[in-house]
Design a protein with these regions (language model features):
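Short acidic, gly/pro-rich beta-turn/loop elements at beta-sheet edges
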Residues: 20-22, 54-55, 76, 88-90, ...
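Short acidic/glycine-enriched loop/turn segments that link adjacent beta-strands
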Residues: 38-42, 72-74, 111-115
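Vicinal oxygen chelate
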Residues: 2-3, 7-15, 33-35, 65-138
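Core segments of cupin and vicinal oxygen chelate
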Residues: 2-4, 11-60, 94
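Glycine-rich, flexible loop segments associated with nucleotide phosphate handling
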Residues: 44-47, 56-67, 104, 112-121
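Generic "edge-of-domain/loop-turn" microfeature
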Residues: 17-19, 50-52, 71, 85-87, ...
């Protein structure tokens, strides 16, 4: 049986990150952590208790993030964990998808400190999805 790669993160676009974090905090009790400009002002959203490595302690539950909504990037998407991001990028293209790359360099994955290598792509139906090669567990 072929290995299944799990969904490990979700991402939602926001026109106003402060307003959106207040909404999800008040309705669902989620916690938010604003990252700096060097990380594109991304907001980490915790939906469940996380360990020291930042990953959820409860199996099957995922955390997420908020990013600035743009005309080209205005839909909610998921992040799928992979063992080898470059191999997964090739598989996406072979299957008819389009590699968008990371936020910082088109066609190349971003190296997110403390997290791993990240890359976005469009599937055959035009859905924006991302892949993540997590850093090895210490």
């Amino acid at each position: 049986m072929k290995k299944m790669n799990p969904v490990v993160h979700f991402e939602m676009p926001a026109e106003d990150r402060t307003r959106m974090t207040k909404f999800y905090s008040s309705v669902f009790g989620w916690e938010a952590q604003q990252l700096g400009a060097e990380m594109g002002n991304y907001v980490i959203v915790k939906t469940t208790e996380s360990g020291e490595n930042g990953f959820p302690k409860n199996p099957g539950i995922i955390n997420g993030g908020l990013f600035d909504k743009t005309p080209d990037n205005k839909v909610t998407s998921v992040v799928i964990a992979v063992d080898d991001i470059r191999e997964a990028m090739k598989a996406v293209e072979t299957a008819g998808g389009t590699i968008l790359g990371g936020s910082f360099k088109a066609g190349e994955p971003d190296d997110i400190p403390g997290v791993g290598l990240y890359c976005a792509f469009l599937d055959t139906e035009g859905n924006r999805v991302s892949i993540l090669q997590p850093n090895p567990k210490m």
